[in-house]
Amino acid sequence: MIDAHTHLDVRSFEDLEKMALSGIETIITCAHDPYKMSTPEVYLDHWDRLINLEVKRGEMAGVEVKVAVGVHPMGYPKNWEVLIKKLPEFLDNENVVAIGETGLHYLTEDEKNLLREQLYLAKDYNMPIIIHTPEKNKKEALIEILKILDEVKIKDSLVMIDHINKETVDLIDRDVYVGLTVQPSMKLTHEEAAEIIKNYNKKFILSSDLGSLKADIYALPRTKLYMKNIGVDEEKIIASVYKNAKGFYRL
């Protein structure tokens, strides 16, 4: 199994060990906003930590850790253009597999420009990109994201739109990867995620979105077992917990 979206820098070493013991082979840890992120230097140090420390912590725990670097819509400096210029330097690292997490949260024009610039980088560098959608105003945010994707003309195979739920899955009218987040306190229960996978034919990728808030380190094995128990097609199960993430991140 591959946990395709986490924030390991705010999780314990013991969590990594438990995930390895539960059958997780690879974990993707994404850039986010653990602080105010009020200056570019804070982001640069954050990216550096993910690449140089979180990968090593994974090795120590017996699980492969790969990294996504990007600028999160919930926290970024006013002069974020500096980070867009610096980001390509990090994309060459062998452990960086994607740009992200980026996306829309408050739906400001500045956020849209920030997302647009990261999408252009992903297009230019042929790099996968992880796009966040918010808990509130998710439909509105998704519609705006789809408009920006049309504008940038990035390949569908490079895009994962994340945190999708049963109210928004029908809005995705293209062959992008669709992220389902099993995080019962804020996003999907494992039962809800399983029902979406059972009833739709899309390129689903499951993740736990482990971070500083309440989450489930066993989200993937729990959902995998439940899908098996309710008769979800085995190919769909394997695709959602492993194969699609492997293809998206080119692991």
Swiss-Prot record:
<feature type="binding site">
    <location>
        <position position="5"/>
    </location>
    <ligand>
        <name>a divalent metal cation 1</name>
    </ligand>
</feature>
<feature type="binding site">
    <location>
        <position position="101"/>
    </location>
    <ligand>
        <name>a divalent metal cation 2</name>
    </ligand>
</feature>
<keyword id="KW-0378">Hydrolase</keyword>
<dbReference type="InterPro" id="IPR032466">
    <property type="entry name" value="Metal_Hydrolase"/>
</dbReference>
<protein>
    <recommendedName>
        <fullName>Uncharacterized metal-dependent hydrolase MJ0761</fullName>
        <ecNumber>3.1.-.-</ecNumber>
    </recommendedName>
</protein>
<dbReference type="GO" id="GO:0046872">
    <property type="term" value="F:metal ion binding"/>
</dbReference>
<dbReference type="InterPro" id="IPR001130">
    <property type="entry name" value="TatD-like"/>
</dbReference>
<feature type="binding site">
    <location>
        <position position="132"/>
    </location>
    <ligand>
        <name>a divalent metal cation 2</name>
    </ligand>
</feature>
<comment type="similarity">
    <text>Belongs to the metallo-dependent hydrolases superfamily. TatD-type hydrolase family.</text>
</comment>
<feature type="binding site">
    <location>
        <position position="163"/>
    </location>
    <ligand>
        <name>a divalent metal cation 2</name>
    </ligand>
</feature>
<dbReference type="GO" id="GO:0016788">
    <property type="term" value="F:hydrolase activity, acting on ester bonds"/>
</dbReference>
<dbReference type="Pfam" id="PF01026">
    <property type="entry name" value="TatD_DNase"/>
</dbReference>
<dbReference type="InterPro" id="IPR012022">
    <property type="entry name" value="UCP005295"/>
</dbReference>
<feature type="binding site">
    <location>
        <position position="101"/>
    </location>
    <ligand>
        <name>a divalent metal cation 1</name>
    </ligand>
</feature>
<dbReference type="InterPro" id="IPR018228">
    <property type="entry name" value="DNase_TatD-rel_CS"/>
</dbReference>
<feature type="binding site">
    <location>
        <position position="209"/>
    </location>
    <ligand>
        <name>a divalent metal cation 1</name>
    </ligand>
</feature>
<keyword id="KW-0479">Metal-binding</keyword>
<feature type="binding site">
    <location>
        <position position="7"/>
    </location>
    <ligand>
        <name>a divalent metal cation 1</name>
    </ligand>
</feature>
